[in-house]
């Protein structure tokens, strides 16, 4: 890796490249050009080359990228060429939906523990996992080798869930709640806010309509 400082936007694009490459692989493609990959991902070919350059040299001039090799190289560079064991805390509607989502394991993230503090939910079985009391999280993290925690609790319980995860030794947290979490410097948090995407789409539509109106005014 040429640089330890890699923009988060680059990491997100690399994840998108892997998703597209895996689709191409399933369709039987063995080689892909930077132009086709860029077009499919809605980015410039130069952006793809720049993103990949953080991790070394890829592809053959005039030939393109070998799909399987590039999938492996990106996954290896991102540390997702292995299985990461995860715990999910908060068994509401969103938590249950994530537990039933088959793509997690396919992508290398295996949710092996489900936790909640509600006695009415403890003992419930979802997708083969029994919901366990949050207070047992520390033992479960050690026994199951859990490294990543997913928080899907109500906002007023998110920090408490975070504290349980940190005390258990978890170093990576994906927070699906609206809460802004307080964590030590060595704990990494990613916030998943679905409304960011709604805002982005709404802005794009609004901007297009505004430009259409401006164009119509100029024609007059």
From Swiss-Prot:
UniProt keywords, alphabetically: Cytoplasm, DNA-binding, NAD, Repressor, Transcription, Transcription regulation
GO BP terms: negative regulation of DNA-templated transcription; response to redox state
Compartment(s) of residence: Cytoplasm
Binding residue positions for NAD(+): 90-95
DNA-binding region of this protein: 16-55
InterPro entries found in the cross-reference section: CoA-bd, NAD(P)-bd_dom_sf, Rex_DNA-bd_C_dom, Tscrpt_rep_Rex, WH-like_DNA-bd_sf, WH_DNA-bd_sf
Any GO MF annotation of the entry: DNA binding
Principal location class: cytoplasm
SUPFAM superfamilies, alphabetized: NAD(P)-binding Rossmann-fold domains (SSF51735), Winged helix' DNA-binding domain (SSF46785)
Alphabetical list of SMART domains matching this protein: CoA_binding (SM00881)
One GO location term (cellular component): cytoplasm
Pfam name, any one: Put_DNA-bind_N
Assembly and binders: Homodimer.
Function: Modulates transcription in response to changes in cellular NADH/NAD(+) redox state.
Family of this protein: Belongs to the transcriptional regulatory Rex family.
Identification of the protein by name: Redox-sensing transcriptional repressor Rex
């Amino acid at each position: 890796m040429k640089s330890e400082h890699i923009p988060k936007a680059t990491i997100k694009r690399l994840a998108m490249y892997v998703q597209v490459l895996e689709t191409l692989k399933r369709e039987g493609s063995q080689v892909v050009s930077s132009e086709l990959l860029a077009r499919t991902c809605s980015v410039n070919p130069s952006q793809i080359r720049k993103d990949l350059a953080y991790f070394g040299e890829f592809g053959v001039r005039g030939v393109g990228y070998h799909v399987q090799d590039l999938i492996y190289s990106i996954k290896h560079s991102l540390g997702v060429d292995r299985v990461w064991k995860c715990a999910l805390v908060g068994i509401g509607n969103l938590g249950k939906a994530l537990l039933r989502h088959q793509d997690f394991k396919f992508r290398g993230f295996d949710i092996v523990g489900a936790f909640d503090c509600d006695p009415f939910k403890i003992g419930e079985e979802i997708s083969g996992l029994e919901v366990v009391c949050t207070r047992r999280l520390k033992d479960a993290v050690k026994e199951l080798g859990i490294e990543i925690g997913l928080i899907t609790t109500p906002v007023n319980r998110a920090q408490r869930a975070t504290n349980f995860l940190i005390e258990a030794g978890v170093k990576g947290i994906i927070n699906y709640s609206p809460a802004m979490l307080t964590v030590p410097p060595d704990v990494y948090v990613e916030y998943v806010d679905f409304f960011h995407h709604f805002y982005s789409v709404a802005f794009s539509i609004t901007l297009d309509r505004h430009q259409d109106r401006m164009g119509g005014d100029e024609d007059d």
